[in-house]
Each structure stands twice: as C-alpha cells, then as structure tokens.
C-alpha cells in the first residue's frame, strides 16, 4: 500500500522508553483503580451512564437520587495528580520535552539529528490513546505540513473515531468502554491538533 510517497522507514516501530513505560504502567494502574471503584459503586446501586466526564473522560455514574458522579475526579484526582506525569498528559509532555532538550544539548551541533514528531504506535486501545496524545506535541514544523499526509492522517483518525463510537454503543464491558472513551477523546484531540497545524 502506498503511503503518499512516504518512506516505510519513517513508520518503523521503536520500543517505548523507560519513561514512557512508567507512564503507561501508572495509567494502567490508575485505570484499574477506577474500574475497581466503579464496580464497587455499581454493586451499591449506582447506574452507569452513556456519558463521560468532560474533565477526565471517565464514564459517569448516577446514584439513586439522580446525582451525577465521576469516580476519577471525585475520588482519585487531587492537586498532586495534576503535576504527576503518569496521570496528567500535559505534565508528561512537559517532562518529555525537558528530557529531549537536555539530551539534545549534550550532543554536538554536527551530530544532532533533525527533530521529528513522534509517530503513534499501534497498541492496545489505552496505549494507542497515549501514543496519539504524545503525537500531538506542540513543536511547530519548520516547513508547512504536507497536505497529503495531513489528509491521510485526518481520514485515518476519523475512521478510528467512527469505529470506536460504534463499538462503544455496543460494548457491555466496563473496561472496554473506558478504553474506547479514552481512544475517542485522544482521536478528537489529535484531530483538533491537525486543524491547528493546517491554519
């Protein structure tokens, strides 16, 4: 399959760095805690809604008095979490940028590779969402983005978004629903970043 003239080498897979692995592990542990808490609330009579929290993307619950409840925002998140790169994508991106700047300053000018935006890795839904979040980092390209690549990427993201939305509608698994919500949010954020690049 031709990729609009792009080299296949441009899309080669690289294993996650130690920092990325720690971030993924922390996210996995956080999702597990959210799932356990949601299970406890469901056993207490709470209902799972077909909506997600606008702040964190977690599936919302409703108690018998019809009060809306977000397990992640109201039980897990705190001010400390906002600075934790394992729980906050912005903090993780900032830490990754600091690490890249520190490693780039150690290299002599002649041996410094040209900066390339990270490419999302096809992984489990949660990993794919994390890869998409990492791919939307703010470094502006030195040249205008290739419109063919942008269009191809936008089409792929829209297809993935449509697929995830359809799957979410038919999903009966709490864990799958949580992961699909994360994927939908990551696709939407990536599409927003693409639109910003085009303007």
Swiss-Prot record:
Its cofactor is Zn(2+). Its main location: cytoplasm. One of its GO terms (cellular component) is cytoplasm. It comes from the Eukaryota. Changing residue 180 to A: Ubiquitous intracellular location. PANTHER family: PROTEIN ZNRD2 (PTHR16537:SF1), SJOEGREN SYNDROME/SCLERODERMA AUTOANTIGEN 1 (PTHR16537). Homodimer. This is Protein ZNRD2. It comes from Homo sapiens. The gene is ZNRD2.
